[in-house]
């Protein structure tokens, strides 16, 4: 592999922009980040969720991680933890995002196996899996052993998750996904999901979201309850 080059000044610039807008946490979706990102997060006071891959042994795309998962997953997760465990900015390990194995009744076995690797290499930090098939994982065993279950969108399932899972905490691992076009205003102003228009633009009033998501106002309301 050729690897990649990074620009520390560019990382610093981006982090300071985020900090200026009030951001204090970053999720490295969905790949292992550069050590330089973790170093600068240490310096600037960010919290960091580090995760290694976007799929397990079931493909989500032709060029994904699935051909290597069975042979390399445990090693790659262990190496990830060893590289980043001494960074104070790291508060959480991730071991999967929107994994198709959520629909598998045996998916919990892989969760436990990878989580055990994280605990072995670093017993001080919790582990999450970020899930989108929330209705399914509320009825099978996929999420039963996850330290802190993560929910992608599906805010209407938060209360069901809290009542069903015994961990006592859930993570909003992906939340609002609003779409807008600068300088374009649609009337009448209405909240819409997956809206399409002949001019291929969205309303600039921040009232439209992707079909799988919601506008930020929903998250703000939940946070205030």
Language-model segments: which ranges?
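Active-site-adjacent substrate/metal-binding segments within catalytic domains
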Residues: 1-112, 123, 127-128
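Structural motif corresponding to alpha-helix initiation and N-cap regions
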Residues: 12, 74-78, 136, 155, ...
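Short active-site oxyanion
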Residues: 24-26, 144-149
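Short acidic loop-to-helix transition motifs that present clustered carboxylates
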Residues: 32-35, 131-136, 154-157
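Glycine/Thr-rich phosphate-binding loops of Rossmann-like dinucleotide-binding domains
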Residues: 36, 103, 137, 159, ...
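Short hydrophobic/aromatic-enriched beta-strand-loop microsegments
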Residues: 45-52, 147-153, 169-175
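Catalytic metal-binding/acid-base residues of hydrolase active sites
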Residues: 53, 96-100, 132-133, 154, ...
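Substrate-binding clefts and catalytic carboxylate motifs of secreted carbohydrate-active enzymes
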Residues: 91-93, 109-130, 141-143, 157-225
């Amino acid at each position: 592999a050729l690897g990649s080059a990074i620009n520390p000044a560019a990382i610093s610039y981006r982090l300071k922009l985020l900090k200026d807008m009030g951001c204090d946490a970053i999720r490295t979706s969905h790949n292992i980040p550069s050590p330089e990102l973790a170093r600068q997060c240490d310096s600037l006071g960010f919290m960091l969720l580090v995760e290694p891959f976007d799929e397990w042994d079931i493909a989500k795309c032709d060029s994904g991680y699935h051909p290597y998962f069975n042979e390399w997953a445990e090693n790659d997760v262990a190496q990830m933890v060893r590289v980043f465990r001494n960074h104070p900015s790291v508060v959480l390990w991730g071991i999967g995002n929107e994994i198709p194995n959520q629909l598998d009744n045996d998916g919990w076995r892989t969760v436990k196996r990878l989580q055990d690797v994280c605990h072995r290499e670093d017993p001080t930090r919790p582990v999450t899996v970020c899930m989108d098939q929330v209705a399914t994982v509320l009825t099978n065993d996929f999420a039963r052993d996850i330290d802190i279950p993560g929910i992608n969108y599906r805010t209407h399932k938060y209360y069901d998750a809290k009542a069903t899972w015994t961990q006592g905490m859930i993570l909003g691992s992906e939340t609002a996904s609003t779409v807008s076009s600068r300088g374009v205003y649609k009337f009448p102003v209405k909240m819409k999901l997956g809206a399409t228009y002949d001019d291929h633009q969205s309303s600039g009033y921040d009232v439209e979201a992707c079909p799988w998501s919601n506008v930020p106002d929903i998250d703000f309301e939940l946070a205030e309850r």
